[in-house]
């Protein structure tokens, strides 16, 4: 799915509004995913998955950092996320459906924190962006 110039502008603007809350929102999205889709917990058997856990916060920060990198490299997502794609495909072997579940949880989290900025156009652009990120992260499964 190709991001238009308007989509790229919407994604950059929305992520700019996230600002210093990226790690916090990443952790919240993970918690939301674990609660809404309990099967996703199977990939984190060694984590304390309770609310506010340091491990969930730490992984949320990693998710946020990866998304920040993706936003900074919208024109080369495969290059920017190549190592992360290798990790998830070859070492962690995460079921690709989980990226969609996390994307949904991220959209809900962003909508709850940025209600006035989360217009239908921004929602659509972020959804396309996260779908592209998911596609890149699962590209090495084949």
UniProtKB/Swiss-Prot annotation:
Keywords associated with the record: Acetylation, Heme, Iron, Metal-binding, Oxygen transport, Phosphoprotein, Transport
Iron listed as a keyword: yes
Entry keyword Heme: yes
GO molecular function, one term: oxygen binding
Modified-residue entries (Phosphoserine), positions: 4, 36, 50, 103, 125, 139
Subunit (UniProt): Heterotetramer of two alpha chains and two beta chains.
Function per UniProt: Involved in oxygen transport from the lung to the various peripheral tissues.
Gene3D superfamilies recorded: Globins
Residues with Phosphothreonine modification: 109, 135, 138
Similarity comment text for this entry: Belongs to the globin family.
GO BP field: cellular oxidant detoxification; hydrogen peroxide catabolic process
Protein name: Hemoglobin subunit alpha
Species classification: Eukaryota, Metazoa, Chordata, Craniata, Vertebrata
In-chain residues carrying the UniProt-annotated modification Phosphotyrosine: 25
Modified positions (N6-acetyllysine) in chain numbering: 17
Residue ranges of domain Globin in the record: 2-142
